[in-house]
């Protein structure tokens, strides 16, 4: 239910010029702590400005220590951490943002808004430069902001120790060798914390009920921060129902009824920073169907709907593995058809070699007709990424398209496995 997917150049290696992109030795440059960089994005459909908010030192870096340079090249935004006046890259990270999705809305053509966002990096031992990039619709990287971080700067605030219980839901594996997920509750009152802990167990059960996650149970840690809300359930503006909740999740995000997200980035990141994390997942205490997932940003899923298990996994496909939605609508044109999308499970055939061409039997037609004889065949089926024409998906059905098949296709499974290994090896 990711509202918008955008595109990537197959020649993305140019995005850093001549900078050195080999993996680096973690302990040489970084401490065990995490640096959170809070910033603002101000803009509309056509323009954007960046402004630094603050720097926060958090207790524990939750990301990888071996794979510090992000060679996935996923996402519409990325950061690079370098030594000042040097071509030596220490860390890079790709991601997407709620702001980027908002820029595609009709509202963005009429008004200017500001969004609070954050990135986290390993806490440096010496001064570093952090450069922020955004990609155009043609996936050309554009530098947006550069800051110098001095780890001895007394304006770097230590993260507050919050008075909320932390629950170890699943796993006790080394942080550097695991995918660390933090679960946050929204719309659970203090009296409903027991329900939240049960929903956390439901999350874990759901996660490991689907391939390929079921094969990697020893590579995940799941922790939860037990923050109560004043009100039960979450906000539903279209029904004139407004709840006071810990994370302010709301349906009708961008005026799309089922899209349930939060604009309160600072609260979300402050709570998440109480534990080491790679991925943030908000469980919304409501029976209404909905949710959302943004790559390397956060996911939301409701817990009371009969499709809750499927929604949890579908949204995590967006947030964790960068998977695109494979369903389509008439009259949408989110993708530029002469550019290969960055998401691993859709293609414009501009650079199909970089996608799943190696998984297609040479007897399968490309594009592949949607016919019963191809029902379980990896092919190239038209209609994906919200567009009925010019964008193709790997199979007739998949969890990223509908919940009828109740499983990921082989292409999505491979993409998920690659991401698990990226974080854990």
Language-model features and meaning:
Residues 219-295:
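Active-site-proximal segments of metallohydrolase catalytic domains
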Residues 316-332:
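Catalytic Zn2+-binding segment of zinc metalloproteases
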Residues 29-154:
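Beta-strand-enriched, solvent-exposed domains that form extended recognition/catalytic surfaces
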Residues 187-190, 228-232, 286-290, 306-308, ...:
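Solvent-exposed loop/turn segments at secondary-structure junctions
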Residues 155-211, 224-234:
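Fold-level signature of zinc-dependent metallopeptidase catalytic domains
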Residues 1-25:
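Bacterial Sec-dependent N-terminal signal peptides
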Residues 193-196, 291-315:
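Short pre-active-site segment immediately N-terminal to the catalytic Zn-binding motif
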């Amino acid at each position: 239910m990711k509202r918008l997917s955008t595109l990537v150049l197959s020649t993305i290696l140019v995005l850093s010029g001549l900078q050195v992109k080999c993996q680096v030795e973690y302990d040489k440059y970084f401490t065990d702590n995490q640096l959170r960089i809070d910033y603002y994005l101000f803009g509309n459909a056509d323009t954007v400005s960046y402004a630094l908010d603050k720097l926060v030192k958090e207790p524990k870096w939750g990301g990888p220590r071996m794979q510090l340079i992000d060679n996935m090249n996923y996402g519409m935004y990325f950061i690079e951490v370098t030594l000042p006046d040097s071509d030596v890259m220490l860390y890079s990270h790709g991601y997407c943002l709620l702001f980027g999705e908002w820029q595609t809305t009709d509202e963005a053509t009429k008004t200017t808004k500001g969004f609070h966002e954050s990135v986290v990096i390993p806490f440096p031992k010496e001064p570093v430069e952090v450069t922020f990039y955004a990609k155009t619709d043609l996936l050309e990287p554009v530098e947006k902001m550069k800051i110098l971080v001095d780890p001895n700067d007394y304006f770097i605030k230590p993260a507050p120790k919050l008075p909320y219980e932390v629950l170890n839901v699943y796993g006790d594996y080394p942080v550097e060798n695991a995918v660390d997920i933090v679960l946050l509750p929204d719309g659970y009152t203090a009296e409903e914390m027991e329900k939240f802990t049960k929903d956390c167990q439901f999350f874990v059960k759901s996660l490991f009920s689907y391939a390929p996650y079921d094969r990697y149970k020893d590579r995940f840690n799941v922790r939860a921060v037990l923050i109560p809300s004043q009100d039960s359930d979450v906000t539903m503006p279209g029904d004139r129902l407004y709840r006071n909740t810990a994370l302010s999740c709301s349906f009708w995000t961008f005026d799309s009824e089922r899209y349930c997200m939060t604009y309160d980035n600072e609260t979300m990141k402050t709570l998440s920073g109480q534990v080491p994390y790679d991925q943030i997942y908000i469980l919304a205490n409501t029976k209404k169907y909905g949710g959302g997932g943004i790559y390397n940003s956060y996911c939301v899923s409701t817990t009371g709907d009969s499709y809750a298990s499927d929604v949890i996994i579908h949204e995590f496909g967006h947030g964790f593995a960068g998977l695109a939605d494979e369903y389509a609508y008439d009259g949408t044109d989110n993708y530029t058809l002469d550019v290969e999308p960055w998401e691993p499970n859709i293609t414009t055939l501009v650079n199909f070699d970089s996608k799943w061409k190696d998984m297609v039997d040479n007897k399968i037609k490309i594009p592949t007709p949607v016919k019963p004889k191809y029902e379980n065949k990896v092919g190239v089926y038209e209609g994906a990424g919200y567009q009925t024409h010019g964008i193709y998906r790997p199979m007739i059905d998949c969890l990223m398209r509908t919940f009828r098949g109740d499983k990921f296709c082989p292409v999505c499974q491979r993409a998920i496995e690659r991401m698990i290994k990226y974080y854990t090896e």
